[in-house]
């Protein structure tokens, strides 16, 4: 039993580390989507573009870029980021790209946002 455990334990640790990294990627993707949504909602309400971007950056993972564009009465927010690979034994695995887009209709009476990038 000891020899089998000695062989299985490193495999279990590697699988656990890989699953933890996949969970981190999933959480990063959710945060990226939330950042795009929060920014789009704020702009649809008529908030200033700088304030809306600041709100989105509070939610986004570090290093995420938010960009705003407007098409008629629609506000489009794109969030792009990257999460590092797991490193260590998994050094060959590249990082993951995080992407999210959110579209919102400008509310009646709200000033439209200006083009902005951050």
Task: Give the ranges of each region predicted by the language model.
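Alpha-helical assembly-interface signal, strongest on the long, hydrophobic N-terminal helix that forms
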Residues: 1-52
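Short, conserved structural patches
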Residues: 45, 49-118
């Amino acid at each position: 039993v000891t020899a089998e455990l000695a062989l299985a334990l490193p495999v279990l640790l590697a699988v656990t580390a890989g699953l933890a990294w996949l969970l981190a990627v999933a959480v990063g993707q959710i945060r990226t989507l939330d950042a795009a949504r929060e920014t789009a909602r704020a702009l649809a309400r008529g908030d200033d573009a700088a304030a809306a971007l600041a709100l989105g950056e509070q939610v986004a993972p570090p290093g995420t870029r938010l960009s705003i564009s407007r098409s008629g009465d629609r506000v489009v927010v794109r969030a792009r980021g990257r999460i590092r690979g797991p490193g260590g034994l998994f050094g060959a695995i590249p990082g993951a790209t995080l992407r999210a887009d959110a579209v919102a209709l400008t509310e009646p009476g709200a000033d439209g946002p200006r083009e902005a990038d951050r």
